[in-house]
């Protein structure tokens, strides 16, 4: 009996089972113990293969692919700490709903806890973060293939969001020519190999039913809060709120066009919060809200009913309102709960939103990161998409910009870490094939610097803007102790990115003014390559501009 041949047949069943659940993209890191999985993936023509040498970046690449494709994405890694490097992407997927299938190769049981090389306790290592965890046995013909395929089907058939961890131990030898070992074992699955359906089909999840009293509530004074959603959903939500005559507070990831822009500014005005107190119902569509003032208002508002509609399960309400947690696709929910044409009931808020935007426009000429955040809508590629990093940059765009309705925007706003952002952006571009503008801070770029290797392979123009404010300037917005702020919070690195771009043979520019930036962008959108643009700004200008605008708008 050939152990290596049967390892590959076992792995082939696993990989083929994945295809029945929509897996097309598969991300592979180098490794020896994962050889059966890697070769099975390579031989399966249903897959689009992606490779990367860094497992942490590989996990985030898969996350970006899943964000756009809306399908599960598989990841193959070898044993040991390679597995642990997938943790950040798995955590993010669990919070934002992307489906990741983590296939982690492992040593067989007799090599665990005995000093064997690259052997750690992998089963259960991700704790509660995967939606499902499967610890497979060592491949053996004593276990029927139908058990293996139905085990995979059960986990994937009931997966609605988050990750599945499938731990796959393989004994040596891992290499060798294929022979007939296990062929009859594999063939007992019959015509399943020619079919395209799962061996075991699970019943679909039950979503929240239509709210029978919606016809009552839609006649009341309501507020719509729009969080993370798809571009198509964003357009529908904007029209729905407009028809109802309810004010729409749109997050940067809502893609609603933010009809009342600069919400994080005008929500700091007492006139706005006073008017919002008249709301009898708040309907929040989508989660992962960004703006600090929006979160403060959300925590303090007390409508008669607070509804949260999102496809992701869980409470999603840190303020613990009395109301309804409705699990549903947003577009489907809107169709079940049609709007009725009514006149807008808010008077002050539209005026404040207009005045807040005018205040932002008045200071747009200076070359700085706050001004870039405001101008970002002018720099979006046609028929493209935007990827926004975390920390200060996403807050500035949320507060100061007005993105077009229905324009795709992506970000990692679940756990909101600065790790893996470039890798995620690479996955977003690969899955969509669209021109992509990505914007991150300097520490975020440093954190995922080796992901520049992924940006060498793009199918359409990709522009990476690194806003270099020399450290974590978001801490300038927080009451961190001034005496220790620079050493323990900001951590300035005093670096530039020209040589990093050169190492990966990427085009690099460092514009000094808006005209130079616009010239570079116009050229970048013409060729399907990556362009790194480093925008060096004064350290604290972005945070100070935001604080000044908050103070100004609060007194309107």
From Swiss-Prot:
Its EC number is 2.2.1.9. Pathway: Quinol/quinone metabolism; 1,4-dihydroxy-2-naphthoate biosynthesis; 1,4-dihydroxy-2-naphthoate from chorismate: step 2/7; Quinol/quinone metabolism; menaquinone biosynthesis. Its cofactor is Mg(2+); Mn(2+); thiamine diphosphate. InterPro entries: MenaQ_synth_MenD, MenD_middle, THDP-binding, Thiamin_PyroP_enz_TPP-bd_dom, TPP_enzyme_TPP-bd. Keywords: Magnesium, Manganese, Menaquinone biosynthesis, Metal-binding, Thiamine pyrophosphate, Transferase. CDD domains: TPP_PYR_MenD (cd07037), TPP_SHCHC_synthase (cd02009). The keyword Transmembrane helix does not apply. It comes from the Bacteria. GO terms for molecular function: 2-succinyl-5-enolpyruvyl-6-hydroxy-3-cyclohexene-1-carboxylic-acid synthase activity; magnesium ion binding; manganese ion binding; thiamine pyrophosphate binding. Pfam families: TPP_enzyme_C, TPP_enzyme_M_2, TPP_enzyme_N. It catalyses: isochorismate + 2-oxoglutarate + H(+) = 5-enolpyruvoyl-6-hydroxy-2-succinyl-cyclohex-3-ene-1-carboxylate + CO2. Binds 1 thiamine pyrophosphate per subunit. The keyword Transmembrane helix does not apply. One of its GO terms (biological process) is menaquinone biosynthetic process. Catalyzes the thiamine diphosphate-dependent decarboxylation of 2-oxoglutarate and the subsequent addition of the resulting succinic semialdehyde-thiamine pyrophosphate anion to isochorismate to yield 2-succinyl-5-enolpyruvyl-6-hydroxy-3-cyclohexene-1-carboxylate (SEPHCHC). Homodimer. NCBIfam families: menD (TIGR00173). Belongs to the TPP enzyme family. MenD subfamily. This is 2-succinyl-5-enolpyruvyl-6-hydroxy-3-cyclohexene-1-carboxylate synthase. It comes from Escherichia coli O157:H7. The lineage of its organism: Bacteria, Pseudomonadati, Pseudomonadota, Gammaproteobacteria, Enterobacterales. The gene is menD.
């Amino acid at each position: 009996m050939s152990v290596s041949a049967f390892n590959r047949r076992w792995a082939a069943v696993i990989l083929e089972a994945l295809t029945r659940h929509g897996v097309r993209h598969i991300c592979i890191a180098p490794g020896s113990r994962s050889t059966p999985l890697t070769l099975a993936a390579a031989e399966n023509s249903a897959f689009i293969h992606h490779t990367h040498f860094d497992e942490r970046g590989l996990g985030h690449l898969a996350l970006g692919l899943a964000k756009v494709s809306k399908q599960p994405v598989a990841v193959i890694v070898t044993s040991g700490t390679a597995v642990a490097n997938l943790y950040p992407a798995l955590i993010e997927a669990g919070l934002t709903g992307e489906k990741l299938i983590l296939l982690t190769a492992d040593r067989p049981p007799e090599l665990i806890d005995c000093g064997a090389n690259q052997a750690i306790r992998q089963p259960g290592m991700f704790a509660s973060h995967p939606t499902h965890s499967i610890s497979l046995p060592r491949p053996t013909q004593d276990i029927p293939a139908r058990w293996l395929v139905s085990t995979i089907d059960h986990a994937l058939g009931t997966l609605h969001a988050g990750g599945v961890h499938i731990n796959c131990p393989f004994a040596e030898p891992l290499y060798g020519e294929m022979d007939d070992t296990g062929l009859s074992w594999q063939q007992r699955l019959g015509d399943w190999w020619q079919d395209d359906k799962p061996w075991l089909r699970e019943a679909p999840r039950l979503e929240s039913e239509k709210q029978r009293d919606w016809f009552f509530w839609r006649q009341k004074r309501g507020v719509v809060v729009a969080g993370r959603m798809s571009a198509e959903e964003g357009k529908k939500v904007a029209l729905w709120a407009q028809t109802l005559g309810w004010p729409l507070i749109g997050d940067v990831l809502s893609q609603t066009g933010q009809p009342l822009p600069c919400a994080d500014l005008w929500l700091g005005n007492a006139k706005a919060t006073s008017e919002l107190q008249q709301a009898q119902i708040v309907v929040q569509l989508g989660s992962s809200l960004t703006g600090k003032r929006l979160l403060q208002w959300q925590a303090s508002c007390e409508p008669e009913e607070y509804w949260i509609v999102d496809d992701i399960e869980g409470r999603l309400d840190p303020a613990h309102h009395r109301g309804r947690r409705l699990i549903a696709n947003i577009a489907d929910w809107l169709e079940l709960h049609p709007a009725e044409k009514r006149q807008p009931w808010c008077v002050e808020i539209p005026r404040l939103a207009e005045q807040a935007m005018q205040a932002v426009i008045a200071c747009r000429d200076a070359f700085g990161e706050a001004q870039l955040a405001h101008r970002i809508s002018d720099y979006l590629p046609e028929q493209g998409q935007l990827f926004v990093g975390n920390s200060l940059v996403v807050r500035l765009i949320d507060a100061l910009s007005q993105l077009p309705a229905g324009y795709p925007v992506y970000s990692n706003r679940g756990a909101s870490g600065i790790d893996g952002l470039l890798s995620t952006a690479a996955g977003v571009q690969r899955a969509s094939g669209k021109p992509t503008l990505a914007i991150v801070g300097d520490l975020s770029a440093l954190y995922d610097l080796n992901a520049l290797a992924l940006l060498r392979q793009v199918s359409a123009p990709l522009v990476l803007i690194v806003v270099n404010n020399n450290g974590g300037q978001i801490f300038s917005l927080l009451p961190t102790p001034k005496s220790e702020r620079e050493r323990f919070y900001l951590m300035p690195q005093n670096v530039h990115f020209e040589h990093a771009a050169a190492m990966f043979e990427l085009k690099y520019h460092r514009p000094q003014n808006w005209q130079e930036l616009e010239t570079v962008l116009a050229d970048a959108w013409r060729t399907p390559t990556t362009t790194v643009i480093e925008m060096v700004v004064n350290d604290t200008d972005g945070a100070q501009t935001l604080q000044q605008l908050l103070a100004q708008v609060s007194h309107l």
